[in-house]
Amino acid sequence: MNARLATAILLATCPFATALADTKVVLPDSQRFADTGRDFLLETTIPGDFKTLEGIVWGLLTLSSKRPDKRFSSPFFPDAISSTSHREGAQPLYMYFRGLRQDGSKVILRFTGDANRYLNNTAAIQELVKGALEATIRLHTTKSTTVYYEIDGQIVEEWDA
């Protein structure tokens, strides 16, 4: 009888445990970035238990502001580019995200042209944005994963900054 009761309790609480699960991501520690510019990408969590790589990237782009440790910055929102000429009319980066494709150890992040406000900004902003995206992807795949960026259907090989 006790085993049945324990099983019933476990089954009843299982959906709540899943709802409270977090996903590991990598975000920049703004103080470390300002101090040394090195070793500033650190592991933290966002709320939600994302199962696919596309879900994890979507969660990173949309929920990074909900991180538990506020010393980490969330470089995917207009505040991150407020000091640059790209800020006028900028939306959060997730508004420009069109999904991803995987082919073996290759991941292609797909965006519309307006994503260049973040992806082709100053070198520092590019480091924060792309660094967090690429490190999070490698956290959930293999370290040898290569990340490419597709803007309006074209793979971008070189960035301005």
Label the model's feature ranges:
Residues 1-6:
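Bacterial N-terminal signal peptides that target proteins for export
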Residues 14-16:
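N-terminal signal peptide c-region/cleavage motif recognized by signal peptidases
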Residues 8-9, 19:
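Cleavable N-terminal signal peptides
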Residues 19-161:
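Bimodal "functional hotspot" detector
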